[in-house]
Regions:
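FIC/Doc superfamily catalytic core
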Residues: 1-167
């Protein structure tokens, strides 16, 4: 997968959720709020449904800023910890945003020569989502938690999974 654009995000969402939702891969047409326990029941400020295309273009533009291949692994992780929450905060779909953004982030990591520990991310799905919440608070954003798990998940060498434990 090489399409790191809003249309690529829609393609991933449709692939993941096309069997579940008629609207898979299509931007939501309603505004949403999701109460977050981390925010004492308040919601992250997601994009207004009419602003989704513009907000996604802006969020994706951050992916084209750094010279990714010149970064160390730690710098790479720090940079993606700031870019992908911007995409997530748009929340272009009614459901499945975290899974879709993490899938795209995994493809992006692998496109740049690293490997993503899928077992770790799956086992820590709640922590990953909470980390996206904390990294999506505008001036109050906190990236430490997302960086921490991605430093563990983004590896320089292939990850060998124990097939016995996966089944």
């Amino acid at each position: 997968f090489h399409d790191f654009t809003p249309s690529g995000l829609c393609e991933i969402h449709h692939f993941l959720f096309g069997d579940l939702y008629d609207w898979a891969g299509k931007y939501r047409i309603i505004n949403i709020e999701k109460r977050e326990r981390l925010l004492a029941g308040r919601s992250v400020w997601y994009s207004n449904d009419e602003e989704i295309p513009n907000d996604l273009e802006s969020a994706f533009s951050a992916l084209y800023q750094p010279n990714w291949d010149s970064l160390t692994r730690e710098q790479f992780v720090s940079a993606i910890s700031r870019c992908f929450p911007r995409i997530w905060q748009v929340h272009p779909f009614r459901e499945g945003n975290t899974h879709t953004v993490v899938m795209m982030m995994t493809f992006f990591v692998e496109q740049h020569g690293y490997f993503m520990d899928q077992e770790l991310l799956a086992a820590s799905a709640g922590y990953v989502r909470d980390s996206f919440v904390m990294a999506s608070l505008d001036q109050l954003s906190e990236y430490e938690h997302l960086e921490r798990i991605l430093l563990d998940a983004v590896q320089s060498a292939p990850i060998h999974y124990d097939v016995e434990t996966l089944c």
